[in-house]
């Protein structure tokens, strides 16, 4: 319901935004050859963003993130290449935009009155609120009035103006600013280094998957709409093109699919499960990661690892009452089909599980979008291909799109309801388990990706420190030799 509400709000925002600008630019919207001249001449769209697990980061398979996927779709719409230009803060983004270094600033940026007066505003495409966070286990504050410790927010953040307005109601409210990023401040809360910080609900949900000690005290604000920002000079054509694109992206379900991919699986945060899983990533996964890498085939090895954790918690001797066994919890029939002799052997189990999943992927209809095929295949891996075919037929009967995972997954629980399963070819199935199965795997994969991203960032910082230190030592040595 929340996703539907947000899409309704976004549609209304789009309509109001369109009324404000459509009359001067209606001819531009109708004519693609009038799109932003500079972009067309250089054949490249340059989008500024912030490197974080929500907007943009480099994964094993290259660039990814919500803003990257939406920017890539817009670049394709304009029929130009895309260059992502990552920066460290919103201030740096707006400075680059003012200087003409980027065409668009896209980093889950909230609507701000002062910035909307200096830059052109794109249509709303998402919504989120500001939330006060504290360390789990500490006393939970009720309002901004009774904070018993230090509140720290990023320097030059939009939060500063929000808190200044709140201070009129809560005169005792104080806060400090820091040059650390929002993600780094959330980590400091989790580690007990600071008492509180405020972050967007999206950032909190994502970072709870890798720092489960982050707890939400309360919403500081209602939901704000999220926008792209454009330069105030010479961007009217680009703004009109963006309106056209965003309207299409809402109508064809692109925004809903991207939102579902990055956010929906985060809704069911489980503190105990996340702590156990992160501990397993640190202590158990390194032993089996080479095998997941070896047998990944066309998959991301982290997806294969997430499937195995969902199946067995990376326990090679796992056995269920139904007879499935091993790292990938294979049935005897599947093991025989994949020609393995010992389901309790980790390598054989991972190899067979991967091969079986690839086999299921090949059986998915070509009409299913590439990015959705794996989720359909995973549902089939869990409950059987026949039941997946049933839920696709049922989705079509109910007026939905059987090739759209977002529409199909909501019907999975219906496979356990008598009014539906009695009319299905393969009958009853615990579809609600398949639904949760896929959601868990997506959440586990997200945690693995972010864990390794943070490890790489830490290593990069250490390398930079050592290089800078070596440069200083080298300079001092040269001076001494003189």
Curated annotation (Swiss-Prot):
Gene that encodes it: mltF
Biological process according to GO: cell wall macromolecule catabolic process; cell wall organization; peptidoglycan catabolic process
CDD domains registered for this protein in UniProt: MLTF-like, PBP2_YfhD_N
Entry remark concerning the domains of this protein: The N-terminal domain does not have lytic activity and probably modulates enzymatic activity. The C-terminal domain is the catalytic active domain.
InterPro entries named in the record: Lysozyme-like_dom_sf, MltF, Solute-binding_3/MltF_N, Transglyc_AS, Transglycosylase_SLT_dom_1
Family: In the N-terminal section; belongs to the bacterial solute-binding protein 3 family. In the C-terminal section; belongs to the transglycosylase Slt family.
Compartments (UniProt record): Cell outer membrane
Signal sequence, renumbered to the chain: 1-18
Entry keyword set: Cell outer membrane, Cell wall biogenesis/degradation, Lyase, Membrane, Signal
Main localization (coarse): membrane
UniProt cross-references to NCBIfam families, sorted A to Z: PRK10859.1
Catalytic activity: Exolytic cleavage of the (1->4)-beta-glycosidic linkage between N-acetylmuramic acid (MurNAc) and N-acetylglucosamine (GlcNAc) residues in peptidoglycan, from either the reducing or the non-reducing ends of the peptidoglycan chains, with concomitant formation of a 1,6-anhydrobond in the MurNAc residue
Described function: Murein-degrading enzyme that degrades murein glycan strands and insoluble, high-molecular weight murein sacculi, with the concomitant formation of a 1,6-anhydromuramoyl product. Lytic transglycosylases (LTs) play an integral role in the metabolism of the peptidoglycan (PG) sacculus. Their lytic action creates space within the PG sacculus to allow for its expansion as well as for the insertion of various structures such as secretion systems and flagella.
Protein name: Membrane-bound lytic murein transglycosylase F
HAMAP family assigned to the protein according to its UniProt record, in alphabetical order: MltF (MF_02016)
EC category: lyase
PANTHER family named among the record's database cross-references: MEMBRANE-BOUND LYTIC MUREIN TRANSGLYCOSYLASE F (PTHR35936:SF32)
GO MF annotation, one: peptidoglycan lytic transglycosylase activity
Region listing for Non-LT domain, in residue ranges: 19-266
Cellular component terms (Gene Ontology): cell outer membrane
Topological relation to the membrane, as annotated: Peripheral membrane protein
